[in-house]
Regions:
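Surface-exposed acidic/polar loop and edge beta-strand patches at domain peripheries
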Residues: 5-204, 210-216, 223-390
Length: 390
């Protein structure tokens, strides 16, 4: 047999502008003989807060497959345009994998309307300090209340982007200066690193408080993982969580402050081989997470119709919640590892720790998640070590 091709990793910026900056693609050649899955590319949007826009992999019997529910870059450039449907960068969390900072999920609070701009403004209060945060989201029902959604980095442009590649690994690094402009508790720098090799895609965000006051920060990610078989019924999920956050309804999705045990419910995804999704919209936050011996929280998405597995390992101890979003009529599962619970400053939580990390001036915190591919059929018969034992 001919030798497998020599793996080479490259980084290309010869791609369309999205958000005013060129998209970046990390790419490597398939190195194996086709028996096992391997990552091939990652496409990133530095002009849109380093959205992890697409990931592709070689899957045995299927060839190169897109792993995220996303659009074409040309379509993204048209949609991510700052227009009415892209308020505060909202289009970024409708596809690909938006990075979320300085909070993930929703902020709820008193709303006022700016008479000059028409913007809805939310008052966020932390330790007696209040700041006006742009409310960029509301539910679909008539009169649904406005809230802040998924942070303030969705449409951020990178201050600089660098790429590096060696024989089998490619990485992109982007730096974001995020002044509060009065809309957060301090100024921040965020450094994003995304690395690709055969077996892993790793995303790292490090936030540093560059202001002169302490602040709370939350970091998260919103990847829409595609089910290659195209059928939601084939999905099996593992999320090692004891509790689920109760919400007022699935339109607002505002937490009530109550945690519901998952044990014995259709939201119990603790079994090693994964559990099926309920036959209903899932838009739930799972908390009280159980780490493995290394201190990592390992979640898995399996697609039994494609012998496909995606292992999502949260490698920061500050990741306290995993949001799961899966509409009944779609073939994706958004699995979102994040620091904070929804509405982390809400009175409904009383004195509970809702996962926001306090940074004094000059302090930093890091969020890290790693993706790994596996084949459930092989995994089930013990040919691949389970992540808890690696």
């Amino acid at each position: 047999a001919p030798p497998p091709p020599t793996p080479t990793a490259t980084a290309s910026a010869n791609l369309p502008d999205v958000g005013g900056q060129k998209a970046v693609q990390l790419r490597r050649l398939q190195s194996g003989v086709g028996a096992t899955p391997e990552f091939l590319s990652v496409t990133l949007l530095p002009g849109r807060g380093m959205n992890v826009f697409q990931i592709t992999a070689y899957l045995p019997g299927r060839g190169e497959v897109s792993l995220l529910a996303s659009k074409s870059l040309d379509t993204a450039a048209k949609i991510m345009n700052g227009g009415p449907d892209d308020l505060d960068g909202n289009a970024s969390f409708s596809m690909g994998g938006a990075l979320l900072f300085p909070f993930a999920n929703r902020l709820v609070g008193p709303i006022t309307v700016d008479k000059n701009t028409g913007d809805h403004i939310l008052t966020a209060t932390w330790h007696g300090r209040s700041v006006p945060v742009i409310a960029n989201w509301h539910g679909k029902q008539p009169g649904a209340p406005w809230c802040g959604m998924h942070g303030q980095m969705l449409a951020a442009k990178a201050d600089n982007v660098s790429v590096k590649a060696d024989s089998d690994t490619a990485a992109a690094i982007a730096d974001y200066r995020l002044p509060a402009n009065g809309h957060w508790f301090s100024d921040n720098d965020v450094k994003v690193t995304v690395a690709l090799d055969r077996d892993t895609v790793t995303a790292i965000m490090t936030a540093t408080n560059r202001g002169d006051k302490s602040e709370p920060v939350g970091i998260g990610w919103h990847p829409y993982f595609q089910l290659p078989s195209g059928s939601r019924a084939n999905a099996r999920l593992r999320i090692p969580a004891a509790m689920r956050v109760e919400v007022n309804n699935f339109d607002d999705v505002f937490p009530t402050g109550k945690l519901l045990p998952v044990s014995g419910s259709q939201y119990d995804f603790n079994v090693l081989e994964g559990g099926p999704l309920p036959d209903t919209l899932v838009d739930d936050s799972f908390v009280d997470l159980t780490p493995n011996a290394k201190g990592d929280v390992v979640s898995e998405i399996r697609d039994l119709g494609a012998n496909y597995g995606m292992r999502v390992t949260a490698m920061s101890p500050h990741i306290r919640a995993i949001q799961l979003y899966s509409p009944i009529d779609k073939s994706f599962v958004a699995l979102e590892p994040q620091f904070n619970y929804g509405d982390p400053f809400g009175k409904e939580w009383s004195s509970a720790d809702t996962g926001m990390v306090t940074l004094a001036p000059g302090e930093s915190v890091t969020w890290k998640v790693q993706l790994r591919l596996f084949q459930p059929a092989n995994d089930m018969v013990g040919q691949a070590p389970h992540p808890n034992f690696q």
